[in-house]
Amino acid sequence: MTDRTKSAAGIVLLTLASGQFLMTLDSSVMNVSIAQVAEDLGTTVTGIQTAITLYTLVMATLMITGGKIGSLIGRRRAFMIGCVIYAAGSLTTSLAPTLTVLIIGWSFLEGIGAALIMPAIVALVASNFPPEGRPRAYGLVASAGAIAVAAGPLIGGFVTTNWTWRYVFAGEVVVVAAILMLTRRIQDAPPEAKHRLDLVGAALTAAGLGLAVYGVLRSGEWGWIQPKPGGPEWLGISPTVWFILAGALIIRIFFAWEARVVASGREPLVRIEMLRNAQLNGGLTMFFFQFMIQAGIFFTVPLFLSVALGLTALETGVRLLPLSVALLLTAVAIPKYRPQAAPRTVVRWGLIALLAGVVSLVAALEVGVGPEIVAVPMLLTGLGVGALASQLGAVTVSAVPDKETGEVGGLQNTMTNLGASLGTALAGSILIAALTTSFIQGIEDNPDVPPEVSSGAEVQLAGGIPFVSNAQLEAALAEANVPSAQAEAILAENEQARINGLRASLSVLAVFVVMALYFTRLIPMEPVGTTSGIPAEV
């Protein structure tokens, strides 16, 4: 490869990685700026959380359709149209005077733009890099997204603390403009022959995925199976179950519809035969587990640092830097220095490193520890996620012909969104359940807490207690005129309950890492840059 060719490839990679970084940055920034955004817009924290939920929902429901649109009109064109829509959403968000305008700009416009951009990125990497160069390219693009999750609190905290959260979204408009200027250097994948978009299939996927994801996102409020006290219920069961079942039923109808479309000679939204491809299934399954575990970690660790230890958003971001650095270096180094490494072996070692990071953090969590305990676990986690990022993108795309990479991009991003939604919801619900159980048991057994107080707390807090800092709890106890001896006992029990909740949540994530190890058998042993043909179906 000549220096000029290397320079062109570098620009393409920078452009696509920047797009991936932006798509992931928003939620991370918004999560650390919720209070400031709510105050600025004159709304509540619940209102901002609704906007976050809708953003995830729009992306998850439209990813498959966005991938197919890219296949029909051209991936670069879809990428550019998505960037324009995304920039319009960012500008609207930066100027939003009310929650309604924020939802229009951020949740809907940015969500629609992301649904066009992210599948196109997957396909454009395939059309701009030879098979042997794709693992490194996909690794860098994937690491850009993961780093955005880790860097979001750092960027959001710094900008929000020193200026205003609006500058983050205004800055995104400038970045998108730069990305659009560089897209002329990107080689487009030729679009498919002109077909009509399968609108019925698009509606079915949007409805099915939307219902399932919405049920998962509301599980913390509704409960998973047993409804929470005072919460809604249908036939004595939490609505979460019904939403997920309804979504699964509609997805089953979608598969039947797609088979009918193929039988009639029309172009389907998704070629169902692709899902019988063992290698593709393996890659998609690993993406699901990676993002579920990754999202759970990015939910629990910042909570520990910011709430339990009282660190600022900026300080929290700094403590996550070992993960970001290790992730980036690993994602780049493995394809560069071990290009012939077996993908299955790399993925397995990545999961082992990820497991070691989670387990070591569980072991280190104690009342009274400082923020330094997360350094080694975050380093190990970064090594693990980086190893996965270096392989999975190339594994999924190499499983199909290049003309189908747009559809694979839609499927891949659907699985990552589902995984991230489920990971955050599971981590949060398990943490609150364990925190509540531990706290109630603790004050019942504590001799400094009168029986009437502990029994009253058991009734009032049965639906779950919030994960609050010592300062927040002290203020609440002082306002309630709780005697100092009782207040100190309650504070001590809350500290221990917080740690127990974090341990429980992380322990469940460790179990999912072990489960993911089982499915690595679907990942090929032969380096994907050297494979020829399409793997056997199952």
PLM feature spans:
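C-terminal membrane-cytosol helix-exit motif in multi-pass small-molecule transporters
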Residues: 173-191, 208-221, 246-262, 517-524
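Helix-loop-helix hairpins in multi-pass membrane proteins, especially solute transporters
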Residues: 71-209, 218, 227, 235, ...
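C-terminal module of multi-pass small-molecule transporters
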Residues: 73-88, 92, 96-104, 117-123, ...
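Small-residue (Gly/Pro/Ala) motifs that create kinks and tight helix-helix packing interfaces
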Residues: 34, 148-160, 334, 423, ...
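Flexible interhelical linker loops that connect adjacent transmembrane helices
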Residues: 2-3, 180-209, 222-236, 260-278, ...
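Transmembrane core module of solute transporters
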Residues: 9-59, 63, 164, 235-242, ...
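Transmembrane-helix exit segments and adjacent C-terminal regions of multi-pass membrane proteins
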Residues: 1-16, 20, 260, 279, ...
